[in-house]
Amino acid sequence: MNQLPRVGLGTDVHPIEPGRPCWLVGLLFPSADGCAGHSDGDVAVHALCDAVLSAAGLGDIGEVFGVDDPRWQGVSGADMLRHVVVLITQHGYRVGNAVVQVIGNRPKIGWRRLEAQAVLSRLLNAPVSVSATTTDGLGLTGRGEGLAAIATALVVSLR
């Protein structure tokens, strides 16, 4: 029996940590401060992981990459996405497409958007669209205290 495609939603928010490398949308932004976190702090990749996992009915990033699990300490977003793809494949799914939007003032990602889309698409083996917005000075992202991201993903059955 053919299963209908499934859609998942993911969000992530991290505070900025001065002096920490800035990984965002799978890319290093050397001139910006990165986000604090158990892994590399890439809010966009973390939101994508959550979206894909939830679409496949496999929980969320906290269940898979728990902060109390030393195996995932400092892990790259790329490795996280690769692991998520393995998990959903084992459960009979593949990613159809995904969208991720970064919410924050810095770093500006527009000039690297196509590069980010290529990197993330390669990691998920599916088209990924990347966009960004600000909150017009409101909240922790508007004050430059943190970054956020929201993502959606569509998964389809392999069976």
From Swiss-Prot:
The record marks H38, T134 as: Transition state stabilizer. One of its GO terms (biological process) is isopentenyl diphosphate biosynthetic process, methylerythritol 4-phosphate pathway. Keywords: Isoprene biosynthesis, Lyase, Metal-binding. A divalent metal cation binds at D12, H14, H46. Its cofactor is a divalent metal cation. It catalyses: 4-CDP-2-C-methyl-D-erythritol 2-phosphate = 2-C-methyl-D-erythritol 2,4-cyclic diphosphate + CMP. PROSITE patterns: ISPF. Its EC number is 4.6.1.12. It is an enzyme of class 4 (lyase). GO terms for molecular function: 2-C-methyl-D-erythritol 2,4-cyclodiphosphate synthase activity; metal ion binding. InterPro entries: MECDP_synthase (IPR003526), MECDP_synthase_CS (IPR020555), MECDP_synthase_sf (IPR036571). NCBIfam families: ispF. Was identified as a high-confidence drug target. This is 2-C-methyl-D-erythritol 2,4-cyclodiphosphate synthase.
